[in-house]
Amino acid sequence: MHLSITHAVTAQEKEELLTGLRAYNAQFLDLSTFSGDIGVYVRDDIGTMLGGLIGVRKGDWLNIDFLWVSDAVRGSGVGSQLIKTAEDEARRKGCKHALVDTASFQARPFYEKQGYQLQMSLQDYPYPGMQRHYLAKREFR
């Protein structure tokens, strides 16, 4: 047995590791419900992206991985539309709940306004004085 360290993980190494992990997890989970990205985007008339959301279905949950809204339209309701549209699509795909994490300098109040409730906060992440907040929305409608 040999132990190695790398700072340049290859696609092959990552896939080999994930194949083993998925095989183990398949004993406990229906992995067919752990697939399918959900992307929702807003663009202007010439195609420039003004905002977007990327999430993934994991069982009964929509995991929101990324949400961004351009300064040009921030505060106009675009973010709320992105969340609502993603939740509607996730529900159509079988999801019942949603999970998101956000940094203290990002969007916790926005998510709470959308009905998400704080589950926990990790202090001093990624740096001292900052937090990473985990929020969930149960039984979204």
Predicted regions located by residue number:
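Conserved GNAT acetyl-CoA-binding A-motif
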Residues: 90-103
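Conserved active-site tyrosine of GNAT-family acetyltransferases
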Residues: 17, 111-112, 116
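Conserved acetyl-CoA-binding loop-helix of GNAT-fold acetyltransferases
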Residues: 75-88, 113
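A conserved beta-strand-loop-helix scaffold within acyl/acetyltransferase catalytic domains
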Residues: 31-32, 44-46, 53-62, 67
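Conserved N-terminal entry element of GNAT/NAT acetyltransferase domains
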Residues: 1-9, 137, 141
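Short hydrophobic/aromatic beta-strand element in the GNAT-like acyltransferase core
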Residues: 37-41, 52, 66, 132
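Conserved catalytic-core motifs of GNAT/GCN5-like acyltransferases
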Residues: 99-101, 117-134
